[in-house]
Amino acid sequence: MDNCIFCKIANGEIPTNKVYEDEVVIAFLDMSQVTKGHTLLVPKKHIQDIFGYSSNDASAVFKRIPLVANALKDAFSDMQGLNILNNNGEMAYQSVFHSHVHLIPRYNGESDGFGLKWEPAQEGTYSDEDLKNITNTINQQIEG
């Protein structure tokens, strides 16, 4: 993609703070640094979002997450946890439409402005029958 910032980074047209690169992915520090070490793992191949991945692409890209995650853990002894996020579509807060995975280190006692919290549905919102119907609908799509 000609105007894709992540394609330009992957092609070496835009400099970045690269932490890892191979033939499939590039990983670099997010410019916003929600927390120290906030890293993006980006496929070099332009894939818009999770819905554009083949099984082979997904396997090749996502199997590299532990490598970067462990590097973050080893690099920052004060890291207490790690959020791994993949936003897909504008409604899900995807702002760069080239698939990427956020690895966001979390530190004890840090008020970093990052939050990930959702409220469970109110009791009774979904009956057992509703849940069975939802399950069947998804299963039908998986089974073809």
Task: Put a short name on every predicted segment.
Residues M1-G144:
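HIT superfamily nucleotide-processing domains
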